[in-house]
């Protein structure tokens, strides 16, 4: 199991946060790197802790393109490469001899990544979900969603596909007999098409129902005391109505959604790259066989797997997610505020506490969208009700 933190010589402390992949992961923080004057030696200091008091193997990855890729070889590393960690953070140090591996000047475009490995293996993701690893990413895009800013996101799971009509119906049927009496029927062009006509409240309640059906702890409650599970009615939930540490299903936050959509790429416009055609995603007049005449519609989830029409490549992104662009707009947890990026937290932002009017974030675009709406950074919001034929969702889970 690994935990990554980043530092830059230009920014003495770029990122410092605790990012658990599970309860006993090692934690690296306060990474600082600086070149020793007159040499090609780079000092790297950091704090490290581990709840299990494991012996950790420390390693370093280095980028010479501002973090886009980490391809600089790092073999000449000395210092605290093996650490007997304790639950209390301890200061440690490494020295990289760049003259051996790089033999160029350490400069402001270089980013250092410190990795602590305890030898543990991550548990497999729940069925139908993928692991989105902890780490930072650049959220936003110049000219689309500004300011572009670095966000640290903790690890979480996300559905590989948008929630299908079949899955919606299965949970809804269980819910109707277990206190979830007002979940709507929804609509879908087929069992394995995404469920449509889902409003935000229904998506949240359905996540709770799915949690209880699978024996997990529900996330959403009817008040800040979190004494009553949210099962019926339309309640404007505050952030303190949410048990963020629960293991049940929930909507992704806007930051989680964008990190997941970008996959393993950096600065990309779409989940697969920077251009789009009808072979990549379902949008207005994209040419798939599910849009006859003037009545376009959804494609089955995961349709763009290499066998789609028009012919194209498998468009699962780097995390294995499908339809993060197109098919249906996807509800996120956050209240929508067009100016939120100017004041959002750097770690695990969960949206503004209040807004002048109630709207929730929608991401990804849909079958009735133009291609601009399908960009990873594109932000939109909608009133929580009603659900319409372009709105759906996928569920997330914490670790």
Q: What kind of feature is each model-predicted range?
A:
Residues 121-179, 194-212, 325-326, 395:
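A short glycine-rich, aromatic-capped structural motif
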Residues 388-399:
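Short, structured beta-strand segments at or near domain termini in extracellular proteins/domains
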Residues 47-52, 64, 100:
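Extracellular acidic, Ser/Thr/Pro-rich low-complexity tracts
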Residues 40-44:
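Structural beta-strand segments of beta-rich domains
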Residues 132, 138, 200-377:
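Functional-site microenvironments in short loops/helix caps that host divalent-cation chemistry
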Residues 102-110:
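Short glycine/proline/serine/threonine-rich loop/turn segments at secondary-structure transition edges
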Residues 8-18:
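Bacterial N-terminal signal peptides
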Residues 20-27:
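Proline/serine/threonine-rich low-complexity linkers at boundaries of modular beta-sandwich domains
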């Amino acid at each position: 199991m690994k935990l990554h933190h980043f530092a830059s010589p230009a920014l003495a402390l770029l990122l410092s946060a605790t990012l658990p992949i599970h309860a006993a992961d090692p934690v690296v923080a306060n990474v600082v790197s600086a070149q020793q004057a007159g040499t090609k030696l780079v000092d790297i200091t950091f704090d490290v802790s581990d709840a299990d008091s494991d012996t950790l193997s420390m390693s370093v990855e280095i980028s010479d393109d501002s973090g886009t890729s980490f391809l600089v070889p790092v073999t000449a590393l000395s210092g605290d490469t093996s650490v007997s960690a304790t639950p209390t953070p301890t200061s440690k140090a490494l020295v990289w001899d760049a003259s051996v591996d790089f033999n160029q000047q350490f400069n402001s475009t270089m980013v250092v990544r410190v990795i602590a490995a305890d030898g543990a293996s991550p548990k497999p993701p729940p069925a139908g979900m993928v692991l989105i690893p902890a780490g930072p990413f650049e959220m936003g895009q110049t000219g689309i969603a500004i300011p572009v800013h670095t966000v640290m996101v903790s690890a979480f799971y996300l559905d590989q596909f948008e929630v299908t009509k079949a899955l919606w119906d299965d949970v809804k049927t269980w819910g109707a007999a277990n206190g979830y009496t007002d979940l709507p029927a929804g609509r879908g062009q087929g069992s394995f098409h995404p469920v449509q006509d889902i409003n935000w409240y229904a998506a949240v309640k359905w996540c709770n129902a799915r949690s209880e059906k699978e024996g997990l702890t529900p996330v959403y409650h009817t008040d800040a005391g979190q004494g009553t599970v949210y099962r019926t009615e339309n309640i404007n939930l505050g952030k303190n109505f949410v048990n963020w540490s629960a293991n049940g299903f929930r909507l992704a936050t806007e930051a989680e959604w964008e990190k997941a959509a970008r996959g393993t790429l950096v600065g990309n416009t779409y989940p697969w790259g920077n251009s789009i055609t009808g072979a990549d995603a379902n949008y207005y007049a994209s040419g798939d066989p599910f849009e006859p005449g003037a009545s376009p519609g959804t494609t089955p989830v995961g349709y763009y797997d290499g066998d789609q029409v028009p012919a194209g490549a498998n468009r699962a992104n780097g995390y294995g997610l499908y339809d993060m662009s197109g098919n249906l707009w996807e509800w996120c947890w956050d209240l929508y505020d067009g100016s939120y990026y100017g004041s959002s937290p750097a770690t695990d932002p969960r949206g503004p506490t209040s807004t002048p009017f109630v709207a929730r974030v929608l991401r990804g675009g849909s079958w009735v969208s133009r291609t601009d709406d399908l960009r990873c950074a594109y932000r939109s919001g909608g009133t929580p009700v009603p659900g319409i034929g372009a709105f759906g969702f996928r569920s997330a889970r914490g670790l």
